[in-house]
Structures are given as structure tokens and as C-alpha cells.
């Protein structure tokens, strides 16, 4: 391919594609762990968001935005967790008209059972890294993520070849 397109940024393409492949593999492996608890990654992420929030609650729209999921999808996930008795809908503290999602006592117990299993899964996924390499990789990934989050349009400043509009 490089001989057909000498200006092709092979390393940049390889890096991005490898991250995509890694993301798929990581999600698949973690999904296997979550399936044992009849949970999807979205449901697990929602439970963690609620639990880690200082108010121990989150609005469905905020969860949708943070998890980059559609609102209808978040509603389905919340409905599933409500049906299991792990999440409840309530009125907002600041605005009684607003809906907030909170973990129930059963949801907190489930979280307490599943967290150690997930932690072991995470450790298994990165077991091949030395502590130094893991620290270095975390720093590089964090920098890359911050750069992407701060850019209005990361592709807008891409150089164009003359005559190829």
C-alpha cells in the first residue's frame, strides 16, 4: 500500500487500527466476565457511574452522554436494571421534576460481589506489562485522549495534498 500512496502515514494508521482492535478484544473479554452475571457492558458502566457519583445518582441523559450511548438505549439499560431490583428511579434533589437513577441496596450488594471479579479480569488483561511499562502506557494513552477531547475537530487540521480536494 505504501508504494501506491507514498504520502500515506502508515504508522498513524497502524496505531489507530491497533487501538480499535484492542478495544474490541478488551470489550469481548470483559463481556465474557459480565455475561456470567447477566450484565452488558453498558449496564455495568451505568452501575459504576451511579456508584462513583458523589450524590450516588445520575440523570439518564447525563449517563447517555457520558457513556456515548443513545437515550433510548440508556432507557432500556435502566429498565433492565430496575427490573432486576438493582437500580431505582427517583426525583432529583435539585429539581423534583428531573429523574435520577440510584443503586438500590441489592444493586450495591451486586456491585460488591462483581467488582472483585472485574478487577481480576482487568489484571489478567494487562498481566503482560511490567509496572513501568503500564505506567508509561497509561501516561501516553491519557495524553492522547486529552488531546482528542480538547480538539474541536481533530481531522479539520489534516494537511491536504495540492489538487486533491
Residue map of PLM features:
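Charged, amphipathic alpha-helical coiled-coil/dimerization segments
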Residues: 79-139
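C-terminal regulatory/oligomerization modules of transcriptional regulators
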Residues: 1-7, 132-165
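Pre-recognition alpha-helix immediately N-terminal to the DNA-recognition helix
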Residues: 18, 45-49, 109, 136
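Short, locally clustered residues in the helix-turn-helix/winged-helix DNA-binding domain
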Residues: 20, 48-55, 115
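A short alpha-helical element within helix-turn-helix/winged-helix DNA-binding domains
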Residues: 62-64
Amino acid at each position: 500500500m505504501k508504494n501506491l500512496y507514498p504520502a500515506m502515514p502508515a504508522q498513524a494508521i497502524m496505531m489507530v487500527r491497533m487501538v480499535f482492535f484492542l478495544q474490541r478484544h478488551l470489550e469481548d473479554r470483559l463481556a465474557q466476565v459480565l455475561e456470567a452475571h447477566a450484565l452488558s457492558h453498558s449496564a455495568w458502566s451505568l452501575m459504576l457511574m451511579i456508584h462513583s457519583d458523589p450524590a450516588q445518582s445520575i440523570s439518564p441523559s447525563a449517563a447517555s452522554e457520558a457513556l456515548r450511548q443513545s437515550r433510548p438505549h440508556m432507557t432500556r439499560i435502566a429498565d433492565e436494571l430496575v427490573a432486576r431490583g438493582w437500580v431505582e428511579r427517583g426525583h432529583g434533589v435539585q429539581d423534583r421534576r428531573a429523574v435520577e437513577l440510584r443503586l438500590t441496596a441489592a444493586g450495591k450488594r451486586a456491585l460488591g460481589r462483581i467488582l472483585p471479579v472485574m478487577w481480576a479480569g482487568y489484571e489478567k488483561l494487562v498481566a503482560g506489562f511490567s509496572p513501568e511499562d503500564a505506567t508509561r502506557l497509561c501516561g501516553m494513552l491519557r495524553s492522547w485522549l486529552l488531546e482528542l477531547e480538547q480538539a474541536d475537530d481533530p481531522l479539520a487540521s489534516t494537511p491536504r495534498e495540492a489538487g486533491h480536494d
